Curated annotation (Swiss-Prot):
Superkingdom: Bacteria
GO cellular component, one term: cytosolic large ribosomal subunit
UniProt cross-references to PROSITE patterns, sorted A to Z: RIBOSOMAL_L6_1
Descriptive protein name: Large ribosomal subunit protein uL6
GO molecular function: rRNA binding; structural constituent of ribosome
Source organism per UniProt: Acholeplasma laidlawii (strain PG-8A)
Length: 179
């Protein structure tokens, strides 16, 4: 029994869900549109503003894919109605970020600047040169781009320098002590 898969998704006003043959879904909302091909063995139904996912049997694979499909559907509905965001902060002397057109430029203590073009469907806010907010309607793309930004200078445990998520805890280590 999939606890997540059995939950009903409430589709908010202003969001339309179109289910085509073979479980090809199109979700449109005020923030944009997402399309996804889901497993065709599952039955996805829209009754009023309630979206449900049902599986044909209790095989192990069907139980696994049931909850995953429901979570993907919920993320699509949530993304087009409210959107997703990830906040990162930069710590370190001389470390900064700036947005130049459609490119994020990072200065992270290397001999060169790191230039990252924005993927389609992603918008960035850089309120201060040490804060970055990644916004978008696709949760996977937002998380992936935030992880790629963080990858260039992960937080180190001694001084805490690097790029970290705002809610991330970095375990600190004590340095060497003199004898």
């Amino acid at each position: 029994m999939s606890r997540i898969g059995n939950k009903v998704i409430v589709v908010p006003a202003g969001v339309t869900v179109d289910i085509k043959e073979g479980n090809f879904l199109t979700v449109k909302g005020p923030k944009g549109q997402l399309e996804k091909q889901l497993n065709s063995d599952l039955s996805i139904t829209l009754e009023g503003n309630l979206l449900t996912v049902k599986r044909p049997n209790n095989e192990m694979f069907m139980r696994k894919i049931h909850g995953t499909t429901r979570a993907l559907l919920f993320n699509m509905v949530h993304g087009v109605s409210e959107g997703f965001s990830k906040k990162l902060e930069i710590k370190g002397v001389g470390y900064r970020a700036q947005l130049q057109g459609n490119t994020l430029v990072l200065q992270l203590g290397f001999s060169h600047n790191i230039e990252m073009p924005l993927p389609e469907g992603i918008s960035l806010d850089v309120p201060k040169n040490t804060e970055i907010t990644v916004n978008g309607i696709d949760k996977a793309v937002v998380g992936q781009f935030a992880a790629e930004i963080r990858k260039h200078r992960k937080p180190e445990p001694y001084k805490g320098k690097g790029i970290r998520y705002v809610d991330e805890y970095v375990a600190r280590k004590a340095g060497k002590t003199a004898k």
